[in-house]
């Protein structure tokens, strides 16, 4: 727990930069609103993640059906830090207690190919490529051509032995490869066969995303790989949802595979992509030019292959009198991890880890009734665990093989009730940072709705608020998208002017990118914001209509004005 600048940086044998200023809560920190041991009342707890020495040893039994593999000499290390505002006013009744959980994983090796006929362990990854082949994909024809090429690019990037399938999506869902049976392992032969099947796909029909994801989930469930992944592309809207309602499909498959989704063209629905990826633990993306899609797919598959730790659980052990409101992923993208409950412990499943940092916002409801002032009380205990391991396990085994993982000590979420108004108003920079990110996303969505309904003045006002928030947060990606819609006169004050030629699709890109967040204040508490607004790379203003156009364009696509060669960005 970070309180007003107190941070223990002693690594404690775990991930660098994480300290362990408390006794190991796995060894018996009492719950039930009791005082946190080892500290005087009112002192700031540590936020450490020193990882204890692993107890899982080399030679532990591999999971059923996989080949034995030696445990790495230096297993992956998981770190956990909790940062929160701990002081709440005693006279305010039941209130929300917010904490930011930072989970860091280090020492993960990427996914490598497997020899299907050899003794190597089964591959960690199984991949299903879902390609929108609805009628709109042939208007223009270059969309379906780019989709085919992107799918082939992704196939070529898969390591040998990786099980894969290709699904053609319309109002129905059809497995075009393999033509029958289960997913096939990647090889020169199966890639060539799949490539022919992909290039034979023709556009026609409607769109039912529920059917696409259901078929992908069934293929992956039959395969049983530790890291099941879906890469979905669409250019439209879920117009045939009644055939297989998406809400029920997401309820069925949440937590069972990861889905990354891409928008292409001019008619796709950003909210649809965000809805799918936030429930299926993925990310939403979009490309403005069809030609960008193959390289974007290649980059995504490359990043995916760096994730070989299948999953971790964030467990929240609630003290009596505390109620869990939610846990959300806030960085690097926003999402809602699925949860299960077993007694007092609530487990949230997080999928497919590489060497990375993710941040989560935990919200608990606590009540001061019957509690002493000035005493540190444990509202909950947070731990990172391997799925299936008993509570308090210092290390565990993750499929495939016998991969040992070094887990950190659990960390308490602490509340201290106070009648000091100064303490009660003390903010936490990290909590505030992500609250502003959510405000940014909400503001962008409201601006999009106002623009769609013709309320341009309202849209401009909201876009000004969004620019001010993005500037404060240091969110360059969002600022770049905002610059396509407005001319930014004063980013701090939110003074903006709507550009000519703005279309609704520009807001779809903005909504999509608003789910990609910045990490927040650094370990020493410095804020992340206040950045200089940078010009969008490769764009310039048309001197005639002032629409943002590619700097290499010979004429403006909006007003057809002839542009001078090599126009420089302002």
Residue ranges and their predicted role:
Residues 320-328, 389-393:
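Short aromatic-acidic-glycine turn motif
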Residues 366-570:
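Long, acidic serine/threonine- and proline-rich intrinsically disordered regions
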Residues 331-355:
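Extracellular adhesion/glycan-binding regions together with long Ser/Thr-
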Residues 2-11, 17-31, 35-42, 46-54, ...:
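Negatively charged
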Residues 353-373:
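Low-complexity, intrinsically disordered segments enriched in Ser/Thr together with acidic residues
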Residues 81-87, 298-299, 344-349, 364-366:
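Short structured motifs
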Residues 1-118:
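Acidic/polar low-complexity segments with low predicted structural confidence
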Residues 83-84, 93-311, 369-370, 474-475, ...:
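Exposed acidic/Ser/Thr-rich ligand/metal-binding surfaces
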């Amino acid at each position: 727990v970070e309180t007003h600048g107190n941070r223990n940086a002693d690594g404690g044998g775990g991930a660098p930069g994480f300290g362990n200023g408390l006794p190991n809560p796995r060894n018996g920190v009492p719950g039930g609103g009791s005082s946190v041991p080892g500290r005087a009342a009112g002192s700031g707890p540590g936020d450490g993640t020193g990882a204890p020495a692993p107890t899982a040893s080399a030679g532990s039994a591999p999971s059923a059906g996989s080949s034995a593999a030696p445990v790495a000499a230096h297993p992956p290390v998981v770190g956990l830090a909790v940062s929160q505002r701990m002081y709440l006013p005693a006279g305010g009744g039941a209130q929300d207690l917010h904490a930011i959980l930072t989970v860091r994983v280090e020492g993960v090796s990427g996914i490598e190919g497997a020899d299907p006929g050899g003794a190597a362990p089964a591959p960690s990854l199984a991949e299903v490529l879902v390609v929108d082949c609805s009628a709109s994909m042939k208007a223009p024809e270059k969309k379906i051509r780019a989709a085919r090429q992107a799918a082939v690019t992704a196939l070529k990037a898969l390591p040998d032995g990786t099980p894969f399938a290709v699904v053609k999506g319309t109002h129905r869902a059809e497995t075009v490869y393999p033509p029958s049976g289960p997913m096939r392992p990647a090889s020169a032969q199966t890639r060539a066969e799949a490539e022919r099947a992909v290039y034979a796909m023709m556009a026609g029909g409607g769109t039912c995303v529920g059917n696409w994801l259901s078929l992908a989930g069934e293929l992956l469930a039959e395969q049983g790989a530790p890291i099941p992944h879906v890469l979905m592309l669409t250019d439209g809207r879920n117009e045939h949802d009644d055939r297989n309602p998406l809400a029920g499909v997401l309820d069925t498959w949440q937590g069972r595979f990861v889905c990354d989704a891409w928008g292409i063209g001019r008619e796709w629905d950003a909210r649809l992509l965000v809805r799918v990826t936030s429930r299926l633990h993925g990310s939403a993306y979009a490309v403005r030019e069809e030609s960008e899609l193959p390289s974007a797919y290649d980059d995504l598959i490359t990043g995916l292959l760096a994730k070989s730790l299948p999953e971790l659980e964030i467990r929240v052990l609630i003290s009596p009198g505390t109620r869990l409101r939610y846990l959300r992923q806030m960085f690097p993208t926003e999402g809602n991890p699925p949860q299960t409950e077993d007694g007092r412990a609530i487990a949230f499943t997080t999928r497919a880890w590489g060497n990375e940092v993710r941040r989560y916002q935990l919200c608990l409801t606590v009540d001061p009734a019957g509690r002493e002032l000035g005493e540190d009380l444990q509202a909950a205990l947070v731990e990172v665990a391997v799925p299936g391991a008993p509570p308090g396990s210092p290390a565990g085994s993750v499929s495939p093989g016998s991969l040992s993982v070094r887990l950190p000590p659990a960390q308490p979420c602490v509340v201290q009730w106070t009648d000091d108004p100064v303490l009660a108003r003390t903010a936490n920079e990290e909590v505030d940072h992500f609250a502003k990110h959510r405000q940014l996303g909400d503001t962008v969505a409201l601006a999009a709705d106002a623009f769609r309904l013709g309320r341009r003045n309202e849209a401009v006002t909201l876009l000004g608020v969004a620019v001010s928030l993005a500037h404060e947060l240091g969110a360059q990606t969002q600022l770049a998208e905002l610059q396509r819609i407005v001319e930014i006169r004063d980013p701090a004050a939110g003074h903006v002017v709507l550009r000519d030629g703005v279309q609704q699709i520009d807001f779809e890109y903005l909504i999509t990118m608003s789910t990609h967040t910045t990490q927040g204040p650094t370990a020493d508490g410095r804020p992340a914001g206040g950045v200089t607004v940078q010009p969008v790379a490769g764009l310039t203003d048309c001197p005639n209509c002032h629409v943002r156009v590619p700097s290499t364009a010979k004429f403006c696509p909006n007003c057809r004005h002839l542009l001078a060669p090599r126009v420089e960005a302002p």
